[in-house]
Regions:
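Nucleotide 5′-phosphate-binding alpha/beta core
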Residues: 1-125, 367-372, 380-396, 402-415, ...
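Active-site phosphate/ATP/adenylate-binding loop shared across adenylate-forming ligases
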Residues: 2-3, 64-234, 239, 247, ...
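Structured loop/turn residues at beta-strand edges in well-structured enzyme cores
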Residues: 19, 178, 208, 304, ...
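Generic structural signal for residues in well-ordered beta-strands
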Residues: 160, 238, 270, 358-360, ...
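Conserved beta-strand termini and adjacent loop/short-helix elements that scaffold enzyme active sites
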Residues: 163, 241-243, 273, 363, ...
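Extracytoplasmic/secreted proteins and extracellular or luminal domains
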Residues: 176, 204-206, 282, 302, ...
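AMP-binding/adenylate-forming catalytic core of the ANL superfamily
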Residues: 183, 290-399, 416
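Conserved AMP-binding/adenylate-forming
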Residues: 220-222, 226-316, 331
Length: 424
């Protein structure tokens, strides 16, 4: 969509961000116990903040552990609420994959609608046509924000096809029967579902009308090897997107900028910082994404450390994330001086189409971290594949990473947020 990638006046954007932020700060001081305490602890008077840059200098980061502690001290919803509890009508919770414990989030109708508007940007940037496209949502009926906001944002604009708890086979048949043109799911599930297309399922590629696959929930949609494999399986264009329960839908991929996520800066004040110093990195450098929510006012977050590792690239006046979300800051493992992220391992593995599933095991050997790659392959595949993968890993990371065959069907399959790295 042309206007999604057109150049914008960054000064005008900053003015709009400050207008929203100024009102937010004053509201939080009066109504939000969590942030009122945080302001006092930092010696910060919201009325004394003189603009976006001043806010960044004075406001400390918000950490996930602070939010967890607040929920534990004031169960079940904590004190991070800007409205009376009776004003909230929507409930979602995090998956708990990064914190070990799900965290509940509540929204008012106004806050919810603000997030739906962000999701509509995702659809518009992917050039979906209202009244024509049919979106198939391959998600179960769960408490996760991504499905509900994506589904409700599409309602009233596109024909929406929910799949609930259907099996993968039933989902493929439903997509073929009703002519779904867009698939919305995680990258892992797009691969898993796509690999069923063919004689075994009775659903051929020719019987499907899918032309676009919108993925979210985990890194993958912007990893070239994962992206190309999904596109080959579906004969469709992949569009990446990312967001999180704590803040909402954050970014979109436009048709004109494949492999790059554009942050919705009208809804978020975004920074990319060095996680050690907290200082903003230069254009073209990598760092941790930090977000301040500007429109989800029922439970806004100020300078929230997302833990997402990204590459900052300014494009046409907008902040974009080159390569999407590259990984998690807390998932990084340092092996022999080399920083390794799970997404980097996946980028290598996905170059080998015979690998059906994989898992990385991390263990201590003589007080040092070591990793090993487990792979599942069809029984008729030569074991020489292990040597090929080991060679590719060595070329990529300049170290030997052992590869071992796992028993067929022994590695977990995932529909939502695949976890392929475990400590043993």
């Amino acid at each position: 969509m042309a206007d999604e990638c057109s150049s914008i006046d960054r000064g005008r954007l900053r003015t709009g961000q400050w207008r929203k932020l100024r009102g937010l700060l004053l509201m939080l001081l009066e109504a939000d116990g969590f942030y009122a305490r945080k302001f006092r602890a930092a010696g910060l008077q919201p009325s004394s903040v003189n603009g976006v840059e001043d806010f960044i200098q004075k406001m400390p980061f918000t950490e996930k552990q602070e939010l967890l502690a607040d929920r534990l001290e004031h169960p079940p919803f904590g004190t991070h609420l800007t409205q009376p509890l009776t004003a909230y009508t929507r409930f979602c919770q995090t998956s708990g994959t990064s914190s070990g414990q799900p965290v509940a989030w509540l929204d008012t109708p106004e806050s919810w609608e603000a997030m739906l508007a962000c999701w509509r940007r995702v659809y518009e940037a992917a050039d979906l046509v209202k009244g024509q496209d049919r979106i198939y949502f391959a998600f179960s009926f769960g408490p996760f924000l991504g499905f509900w906001t994506a589904y409700e944002a599409a309602n009233g604009h596109y024909l929406t096809l929910p799949s609930g708890g259907l099996s993968s086979q039933a989902r493929l048949e439903m997509m073929a029967r009703y002519g779904a043109t867009v698939l919305c799911c995680t990258p892992t599930y797009a691969l898993r579902l796509g690999e069923l297309i063919g004689p075994g399922s009775g659903v051929s590629l020719e019987s499907l009308a899918v032309k676009k696959v919108i993925v979210a929930g985990e890194p993958g949609g912007s990893i070239p090897e994962v992206r190309s494999r999904i596109e080959a399986l579906w004969n469709a264009r992949v569009y990446d997107h990312h967001g999180m329960t704590e803040v909402g839908p954050v970014s979109y991929e436009a048709t004109e900028t494949p492999g790059r996520l554009t942050v919705i800066e009208e809804a978020y004040l975004a920074e990319v910082v060095d996680p050690e110093t907290g200082v903003e990195v230069e254009d073209g450098q990598q760092g941790e994404l930090v977000l301040t929510t500007l429109v989800r006012t029922a439970g806004p977050l100020l300078r929230y450390r997302t833990g997402d590792w990204v590459k900052k690239v300014m494009h046409a006046g907008r902040l974009t994330l080159e390569g999407g979300v590259l990984g998690r800051v807390d998932d990084m493992v340092v092996l022999r001086g080399v920083n390794i992220y799970p997404s980097a391992i996946e980028a290598v593995v996905r170059q080998f189409s015979d690998v059906e599933e994989f898992m990385v095991e991390q263990r201590k050997v003589d007080a040092m971290d070591e990793i090993e790659l487990l792979i599942e392959v069809p029984g008729n595949v030569s074991k020489s594949l292990l040597k090929q993968i080991e060679s590719k890993l060595r070329d990529t990371f300049s170290m030997r990473i052992p590869v071992r065959l796992a028993e067929p069907g022994s590695l977990p399959r995932h529909e939502f947020k695949a976890k392929r790295w475990r400590k043993v």
